[in-house]
């Protein structure tokens, strides 16, 4: 199922490349005016081995050499979204919710959750971004997501998860398109070279519940709870 989702993205990317019909994110031109904020449970890739991160950065750098004007997620902001608890909403503020209640549920669920291991192999893309494909090695991530969904809902807390789509993948976004692509076919060829590239594996043991903007920029992010 996860591979089918990645393949569906890839098919749309090929069409966008052939037609030069990319979806450019104008918010990335002026981040300071973007007021969209949300609540997310996540884990950062930086806790992984150096070799895996080096491989990801190597690919990201290769893209940057041919498309220097796009947006590149910094290494320390690369993340795996466990659950988008409240999807980013314009002008959303922390004083609208009881953050302790969310933190309590987060801690309750994570206490009984094992580490999450993800295999990173291949890249896929869409008309608006490029991601590294992640594949959980077992059902621990799925169980964690479902437990968070259940307990947050049972607690009667404000949530919007699964409003756009039910999160089942383990991808990490690394490039977003904000300006016209200068050479779509060259970019496509590079992505094809890495379509099945083995980046490595990461065992995630540290998790956070954060208040964030759309791009998980650390300058905006506020940690509400952490578990390790």
Provide a role label for each language-model segment.
Residues 1-228:
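Histidine-dependent nucleotide/RNA phosphoesterase domain, centered on the 2H-phosphoesterase fold
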């Amino acid at each position: 199922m996860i591979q089918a989702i990645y393949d569906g993205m890839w098919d749309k990317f090929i069409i966008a490349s052939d037609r030069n019909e990319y979806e450019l994110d104008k918010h990335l031109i002026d981040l300071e005016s973007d007021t969209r904020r949300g609540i997310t449970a996540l884990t950062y890739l930086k806790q992984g081995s150096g070799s895996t991160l080096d491989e990801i950065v190597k690919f990201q750098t290769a893209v940057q050499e041919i498309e220097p004007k796009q947006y590149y997620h910094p290494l320390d902001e690369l993340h795996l979204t466990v659950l988008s608890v409240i999807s980013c909403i314009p002008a959303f503020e922390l004083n609208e919710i009881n953050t302790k209640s969310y933190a309590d549920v987060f801690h309750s669920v994570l206490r009984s959750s094992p580490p999450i291991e993800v295999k990173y192999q291949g890249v896929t893309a869409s008309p608006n971004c490029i991601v590294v494909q992640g594949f959980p090695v077992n059902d621990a991530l799925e169980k964690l997501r479902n437990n968070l969904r259940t307990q947050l809902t049972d607690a009667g807390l404000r949530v919007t998860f699964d409003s756009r789509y039910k999160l089942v993948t383990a991808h990490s976004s690394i490039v977003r398109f904000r300006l016209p692509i200068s050479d779509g076919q060259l970019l496509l060829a590079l992505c094809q070279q890495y379509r099945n590239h083995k980046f490595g594996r990461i065992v995630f043991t540290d998790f956070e519940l954060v208040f964030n903007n759309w791009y998980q920029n650390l300058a905006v992010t506020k940690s509400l709870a952490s578990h390790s």
